[in-house]
């Protein structure tokens, strides 16, 4: 039987169910076999206990038995030797609800102390190598705010998977072999001529931004008018390479300033230089997935569930972007990645079935490629929409947003919604030093705790360890709620890793910070009661650890003073 392990209490309750099922099988009450996993979830309302499982309902079809009867059978075989349960209840069609003894909750703080900055880590992905490819914007201009959201989503997914034991490789795919690159070179070439006094008609397909004029000016300053006497085709190649090189270096620097560093920048050109596309097409043809129609090569993606077959080589003999994309993914698997995660703009949703067809044709499972879609960002200033682009077509850049609101606020705000939902980003709110600003609200909780710990030290109070506190003193509802929330952190990380949903971490942080601020405003941590002071200091120290661990996952700092 597969067991889904999260936090300590969750694991113990899961084992309780597993052992009860084994007992039922041993007595012939249930038939043996491959049982479904035991899923144990923390309840949203304590009226229904602290944890609940729907295992009996999932088992009903397997056992061909009424789910409530299965639930009763399993419950009657619970052997709670550790005495962690106050009681269990069967609810609805067959849920089993678990009520944990109050004194057990405080014991969970020991795990936080002993694991420290590793609290929340897991070994789920041990031995598995995962590549996360994200941003991958053409080097034709600065990264804009849409790229910024995808950059944070990809980076934090990589962090979460790394904390879950996976070996992570971050990669940026440089689309530098298509018509857009040629248009970049033409754009700079035309501006260069303009700067030298020539009258040039500027096509609509060319890039209009001021950065194009700046690059042309750099070339003019360096080379003078020497390029006017050169062949236009060779000029465009030179201007393309020169501009792409400058833009890519600026992209790398902007990403670094945003806290994002890639393990590899993979050039699309490598696929052609190393015959990657040609080898892919030969491989697909050998497997019978290619056919020719009117001098066009088609890939039979419908064999793998796509709604129509796709062109991989045009009539002019040029491979399509799709062919290059499959070749690139073939290269990924050849480099030994067990799984590949791509972060795409939501407008690429229709591209997923053909990519799944491509990797299946190469002999890989559909599950070996997971795609996370990132929706658009609506930029606001005090609730009013901000123009996302100028008349010349320049978008608000990632650098402009990060420079205005700061790295921490930008990263946190981009993760305030599910990645596949539209996001409103208010620049003024993100700059406020108040509870209206979500990242300030969370960071202030951490800074507040640091202030409490400094005050204790100034008063000569030694910061306690679990051995010299009295956890049974932590019994008021606010303290139990805080401990339960702290206990939930490993489950949140596990859930985020499984679903590739980094917003779960920000939601969790908002909850934890809210509970702490409310507790702080209502109760004194440092008081005349020495035992209570030590115990509450230990509690807030644990809260500090979890806040910092969660913020670190998001690539956001945990300031000690604010």
UniProtKB/Swiss-Prot annotation:
The UniProt record lists the keyword ATP-binding: yes
Enzyme Commission (EC) number: 6.1.1.19
InterPro entries listed in its UniProt record: aa-tRNA-synth_I_CS (IPR001412), Arg-tRNA-ligase (IPR001278), Arg-tRNA-synth_N (IPR005148), Arg-tRNA-synth_N_sf (IPR036695), ArgRS_core (IPR035684), DALR_anticod-bd (IPR008909), Rossmann-like_a/b/a_fold (IPR014729), tRNAsynth_Ia_anticodon-bd (IPR009080)
Catalytic activities: tRNA(Arg) + L-arginine + ATP = L-arginyl-tRNA(Arg) + AMP + diphosphate
Predominant location category: cytoplasm
Annotated GO biological process: arginyl-tRNA aminoacylation
MF terms (GO), sorted A to Z: arginine-tRNA ligase activity; ATP binding
Compartments it resides in: Cytoplasm
SUPFAM superfamilies, per the entry: Anticodon-binding domain of a subclass of class I aminoacyl-tRNA synthetases (SSF47323), Arginyl-tRNA synthetase (ArgRS), N-terminal 'additional' domain (SSF55190), Nucleotidylyl transferase (SSF52374)
Database matches in PROSITE patterns: AA_TRNA_LIGASE_I
Top-level EC class as recorded in UniProt: ligase
GO cellular component: cytoplasm
Tree of life domain: Bacteria
Motif ('HIGH' region): 137-147
Keywords: Aminoacyl-tRNA synthetase, ATP-binding, Cytoplasm, Ligase, Nucleotide-binding, Protein biosynthesis
NCBIfam families: argS
Subunit architecture: Monomer.
HAMAP family (alphabetical): Arg_tRNA_synth
Similarity-based family: Belongs to the class-I aminoacyl-tRNA synthetase family.
Name of the protein: Arginine--tRNA ligase
The species this protein was found in: Syntrophus aciditrophicus (strain SB)
Lineage of the species this protein comes from: Bacteria, Pseudomonadati, Thermodesulfobacteriota, Syntrophia, Syntrophales
